[in-house]
């Protein structure tokens, strides 16, 4: 191999690495990490809200594991007109104006869940929610567009309400409210916000 050829190959390799770095930085810049439970072993307490506030007997808990990840689990009961369990993060303003969707990385149990967001901290504040299905035992990434979130209050859809305002997100969480009694388990790796509702193509 000539000196000129070797130099050219090194130049091409350098350009390739530079391009890869630019691509990785671009992808990183297009997302904002809200919670990464792989690196987070301590966090302001997440709040459990179950149907016992309305006389139900469903139970749940939220655990941040020391070896990485978080688990939202429990038992849904339909007794006493109950049937839901939920958890939400501690209040804290997230300005997500430059984003268009939430990205959640998790492993479910085949049940249907809802990802929730609040833009106010009051007890009577509306709860914005977007449903997603899980596949039992499979790691999945769900991209939930802000425009698909529905304003609700105590399980009822609100009409005449503005869409989810990404500039004023105060907390996020998970809700299970399908009419199916029994245990549930959701393993969560991370919660992020992204500019693209569609997953970026691999370089």
Q: Can you name each region flagged by the protein language model?
A:
Residues 2-14:
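Bacterial N-terminal signal peptides that target proteins for export
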Residues 13-23:
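Bacterial N-terminal signal peptides
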